[in-house]
Amino acid sequence: MDWNRVEGNWKQVKGKVKEQWGKLTDDDLDQISGSREQLEGKIQERYGIEKDRVRRDIDDWYGRQTWNW
């Protein structure tokens, strides 16, 4: 997984993140600014999911995406 590409294209990616994790606010997404660690933390906070599960969910989500870099 090349998370650096996600960080570098965050403005385009955050819409897909919002579709998957709708409880994240626009302010959350702006604050995350592409940081995987911050995304994990916000998902944990909003959904009450343990860290290992959040990591797996993000990996699964990332693998399902069609990226047009």
Swiss-Prot record:
Keywords: Plasmid
UniProt-listed InterPro entries: CsbD, UPF0337_stress_rsp, YjbJ, YjbJ_sf
Gene3D superfamilies noted in UniProt: YjbJ
Pfam families: CsbD (PF05532)
Coiled coil: none
Top-level lineage group: Bacteria
Family named by the database record: Belongs to the UPF0337 (CsbD) family.
Protein name, UniProt field: UPF0337 protein RB0906
Species the sequence originates in: Rhizobium meliloti (strain 1021) (Ensifer meliloti)
Source taxonomy: Bacteria, Pseudomonadati, Pseudomonadota, Alphaproteobacteria, Hyphomicrobiales
